[in-house]
Structure formats: C-alpha cells, structure tokens
Amino acid sequence: MKHLLSIADLDRESAVELLDEAERFEQALLGREVRKLPTLRGRTVMTVFFENSTRTRVSFEVAGKWMSADVINVSASSSSVSKGESLRDTAMTLRAAGADALIVRHPASGAAHQIAKWTGAADDGGPAVINAGDGTHEHPTQALLDALTLRQRLGDIEGKRIAIVGDILHSRVARSNALLLSMLGAEVVLVAPPTLLPVGAHTWPVTVSHSLDAELPGLDAVLMLRVQAERMNGGFFPSQREYSINYGLSEKRLAMLADHAVVLHPGPMLRGMEIASAVADSSKTAVLQQVTNGVHMRMAVLFRLLVGSEDGAL
C-alpha cells in the first residue's frame, strides 16, 4: 500500500491488519516512562491542513512523535498558499524539501488523490500521502479508528447493526464508515432527513431510514454526525430545534438503546443539537476512547506506509 486515500485502498484483510497493528502499538507503549518508539526515526512527516482541525491534526502529530519521526506542520494560512501559490507547487515543494509522508486535509474532494499523482509513486521517491479529509468525500483514518473503538466495545463488528445519523450529505466520515463497516460485516443504516442524504446513497452498501426512534432499539452502535452548516448554502431543515427534536440523541432516546450499545461521534460535537450534553458525557459514549484510538490507529497507518508489515518489530 503506497497511500491511504480512500477506504477503497483497503480490503477486509488489510483493514483488520491495521486494526490489529493499532492495538499492538497501544500495548507497546504501555508501561513506558517515555512514550517513544524508534520506529520512524529519521523519517519526515508533514501535516498539510487547509481546513481547521483539532482531533485529526493533533493525533497525527502525536502518532508521528511517539514513533520518533520529525513532524512538521504546514498551515495554509502561514504558507505561500496565502500568497496565491498553487496546490501543485506547494505539494512539489514539500516533496523537494524531503517529506516522507504528507498528511493532507483540504476542502476540495479529491485533493489528496491529486497530490499523490503530482508527487509521484511512493516507491519512486515520492512521499506517502494520507487523506486526512477531502471535502465531503472521505476520511479513511477516522473510519478505521471508529472501527477499532467499536471492536473494543462490542467484541466484534461482524453482524452488528450500526446507524450513522445526521448530516450524511456533507459528511466524509459517513462515506468512509459506511464502506469500512460494511466491509467488516456490519449492517449499516443511514438515518437522516431526505434533504441530508446524498443522491447516490442508494448505491452504498447500506439501508436508509428517516426515523431515528424506529431504529434505536435494534442498534448495537450509533454514530452521531454534526450538521455542517459551513458547507450549506440553503435551508436543509426548518430549524435547529426541529432537527434536534427529530434527529438529536437525547437522554430519552439513549434509554431506548440496548444495554451493550455504544455511541460514537467524530467531533466536534454540537451539544444540544445532535447530541444532548448528558448523553455526550455518559458511559455509553466513547468519544474520548475514539481520540485515544486515533493516535494508535494513525501510528499503525504511518508504520504500514513508511515501514511496511514485513520490515521488523515495533
């Protein structure tokens, strides 16, 4: 695997191997006074973010540093992009500067794929490119860390019924999760108002529902999504209050879930809209576990791309 641009870059076997690898990194760090492994010593990892981020950016930085990589942050606002430099010139500059990996977030769908083409194949001296979110397209490492969290909470993903709820239309997280979770054997249901479902949702390996209340009792897990108002130009629902009434995860709705069920959210959470504050802080909700798993999962991805599965121990 040269890049991780989409869940389509993985098959079931390689996805499970990444989940297992992430757990091995977690175990390798346990009990260490200094959380450092020599795995990526001498490698240069660059995070290139053209959109704001807390969880994804920080976890990639921590992952790289815990593996002894040299991590360099490139912010669009402080780079030559702000002076009008093209994305291609920026990407080629970072390659020439010695990047072994480029971790890219960009508001345009397909940006990471394009950067991978421009900078060349990883086995021909070009950097490995990791898609950290491209527009409304995909966010593969988020789906992987969500799958890891579900596996830890539920024991297995095979045969589980998992709902993805909310703004599916604008969500790269929904797309990647739908593909990965179904690949791992889950039954995935999208729950959203018709206006927040993409036109091609019927082609995804999912079922579709417009009623959250009808789905909750039969779920093993629910992934709540933020309404991405920054990507909306029109009225997709009458009001925030009505949206919350119909699709928000309230304490009453939380009680409708099975005892073993788990609640996920990729963040940032809009407390009081898609998720009640009490629900966000409940023991059923695995938001902070997702963040922790995000570091280990991204360590596994960096290891797989820059070292490979056969080149030695952690």
From Swiss-Prot:
Which InterPro entries is this protein grouped with? Asp/Orn_carbamoyltranf_P-bd, Asp/Orn_carbamoylTrfase, Asp/Orn_carbamoylTrfase_sf, Asp_carbamoyltransf, Asp_carbamoyltransf_Asp/Orn-bd
Q: Is this entry keyworded Membrane?
A: no
Q: What SUPFAM superfamilies has UniProt attached to this entry?
A: Aspartate/ornithine carbamoyltransferase
Q: Which reaction does it catalyse?
A: carbamoyl phosphate + L-aspartate = N-carbamoyl-L-aspartate + phosphate + H(+)
Q: Give the record's pathway.
A: Pyrimidine metabolism; UMP biosynthesis via de novo pathway; (S)-dihydroorotate from bicarbonate: step 2/3
The keyword Ubl conjugation belongs to this UniProt entry's keyword annotation: no
* UniProt GO BP: 'de novo' pyrimidine nucleobase biosynthetic process; 'de novo' UMP biosynthetic process; amino acid metabolic process
Matches recorded under Pfam families: OTCace (PF00185), OTCace_N (PF02729)
Q: Where are the transmembrane segments?
A: none
Which UniProt keywords are present, listed alphabetically? Pyrimidine biosynthesis, Transferase
What GO molecular function annotation could you give as one example from this UniProt entry?
Answer: aspartate carbamoyltransferase activity
Q: What is its EC number?
A: 2.1.3.2
Residues the record lists as binding L-aspartate: 83, 172, 226
Q: Tell me the function of this protein.
A: Catalyzes the condensation of carbamoyl phosphate and aspartate to form carbamoyl aspartate and inorganic phosphate, the committed step in the de novo pyrimidine nucleotide biosynthesis pathway.
Return the similarity comment: Belongs to the aspartate/ornithine carbamoyltransferase superfamily. ATCase family.
Q: Which PANTHER family does the UniProt entry name for this protein?
A: ASPARTATE CARBAMOYLTRANSFERASE, ORNITHINE CARBAMOYLTRANSFERASE, MITOCHONDRIAL
Name of the protein this chain belongs to: Aspartate carbamoyltransferase catalytic subunit
Which organism encodes this protein?
Answer: Rhodococcus erythropolis (strain PR4 / NBRC 100887)
Q: State which gene encodes it.
A: pyrB
